[in-house]
């Protein structure tokens, strides 16, 4: 009788405990679902915007960037929202007509007001950085350069954005900002932090060097193997995300592809006769009339200036790659180097180190040849062969083959391709082997490779000197531990259910 009573009590307790466990499990499932839905509920997008105008020597581009405000100091989160090319030449060409600058900028600035929400416009910074074209204008006339920048500032202040200034950036800044841009977008500045992650300096990701070619200047920037540079003026120091960088950077003013062509013409016309210049850097059959006043209208050709017996001369193409190459090398002065190693014109250049991203005109010209060769530009030798063959084509055939390409660019591709090969090989000391380390970049993660993003990141202090704090546990470790503890909990519940459903296995009578 006592046994029957005891058995009933045990069954009653077991049922009640099972009911409580079942009810608790249902509540737990509901709670997990509620937490999951709450955690994954999309939040209102909190986005910030920034505008940078790249006032180059040949044209002006406007870039609108956006990034999530809560991830402002993360690497690689800034995205290019919109790009607008301002119609017309570079702002330096408006030195004598500054009253036209407002209309010049109007279309792209109006587009900006349409792309950026009105509620965000007052806190959207606007920066204008002018490069080599304005550096050259300032060399000719500081007053004219100041008047252009003042007119630009008046125009940009009239829009509902937070105008932060218009300035002429130095060649060093241009090189450094380009280096920051490509390494930021490639994620080269940060390492994933965790309690299990110990990374030595030798294991950290190597940065890319930066090669920039514009219309009026070219820049080379990279982290050299030897951190002590022979020419201190070519060195810059950065502390980014907790890592110190010593960067070599130099800008060669007058060696952008447009000014380099003017230099070559000014040099070659000195030994021509009769107002005709036979030029191997243009296609056979190509003809163009050049005004002497325009030829000597830039500071880059002043060293070649002399009194000519004519006001105009005609360029007649002969299309010979080897002769073109030799004529280009003449204005790379390699006769004197006061350092252990130089680029050209006696400028110190340490041994090249690592991979390089080549952008701006480097990319645009190489992309043309790559498409022309059906993506078969695999080596320096192949690029040389393609350029050599292209230069020898008759001008009429070239025009017929590429009817959609603007004649100015098309007519200069022979020179541009030859100049890039000469600059990289004889100017910057790349070889057929190290050529493979050059990566020609147009966009990285949908953002333009170039100095503008690095410029904005610097001015908005969006790259901290120290690595942002990360959670004690990485997300993957957190998930793993949660799964482990959940499995342990489930195992305990199953064991408990088994105990109460099969009490005879565990509740033995004492002997």
UniProtKB/Swiss-Prot annotation:
Gene3D superfamilies in the cross-refs: 3.30.420.40, Exopolyphosphatase. Domain 2
Positions of disulphide bridges: 84-108, 254-300, 281-324, 337-342, 391-414
Record bears the keyword ATP-binding: yes
Active site positions, chain numbering: 174 (proton acceptor)
Topology term for the membrane: Multi-pass membrane protein
Any single GO CC term annotated in Swiss-Prot or TrEMBL for this entry: synaptic vesicle
Subcellular location: Membrane; Membrane, Caveola
Main location: membrane
Keywords in alphabetical order: ATP-binding, Calcium, Disulfide bond, Glycoprotein, Hydrolase, Magnesium, Membrane, Nucleotide-binding, Transmembrane, Transmembrane helix
Glycan attachment positions: 73, 226, 291, 333, 374, 429, 458
Required co-factors: Ca(2+); Mg(2+)
UniProt cross-references to PROSITE patterns, sorted A to Z: GDA1_CD39_NTPASE (PS01238)
UniProt modification remark: N-glycosylated. The N-terminus is blocked.
GO biological process, one term: cellular response to lipopolysaccharide
Gene Ontology terms, MF aspect: ADP phosphatase activity; apyrase activity; ATP binding; ATP hydrolysis activity; CDP phosphatase activity; CTPase activity; GDP phosphatase activity; GTPase activity
Ranges facing Extracellular side: 38-478
Region annotation (N-terminal lobe) ranges: 46-171
Transmembrane segments: 17-37, 479-499
Catalytic activity: a ribonucleoside 5'-triphosphate + 2 H2O = a ribonucleoside 5'-phosphate + 2 phosphate + 2 H(+); a ribonucleoside 5'-triphosphate + H2O = a ribonucleoside 5'-diphosphate + phosphate + H(+); a ribonucleoside 5'-diphosphate + H2O = a ribonucleoside 5'-phosphate + phosphate + H(+); ATP + 2 H2O = AMP + 2 phosphate + 2 H(+)
Enzyme class: hydrolase
Enzyme Commission number(s): 3.6.1.5
Function: Catalyzes the hydrolysis of both di- and triphosphate nucleotides (NDPs and NTPs) and hydrolyze NTPs to nucleotide monophosphates (NMPs) in two distinct successive phosphate-releasing steps, with NDPs as intermediates and participates in the regulation of extracellular levels of nucleotides. By hydrolyzing proinflammatory ATP and platelet-activating ADP to AMP, it blocks platelet aggregation and supports blood flow.
Family the UniProt entry places it in: Belongs to the GDA1/CD39 NTPase family.
Subunit structure comment from the entry: Homodimer; disulfide-linked.
PANTHER family (UniProt xref): ADENOSINE/GUANOSINE DIPHOSPHATASE (PTHR11782), ECTONUCLEOSIDE TRIPHOSPHATE DIPHOSPHOHYDROLASE 1 (PTHR11782:SF32)
Protein name in the entry: Ectonucleoside triphosphate diphosphohydrolase 1
Species in which this protein is naturally found: Rattus norvegicus (Rat)
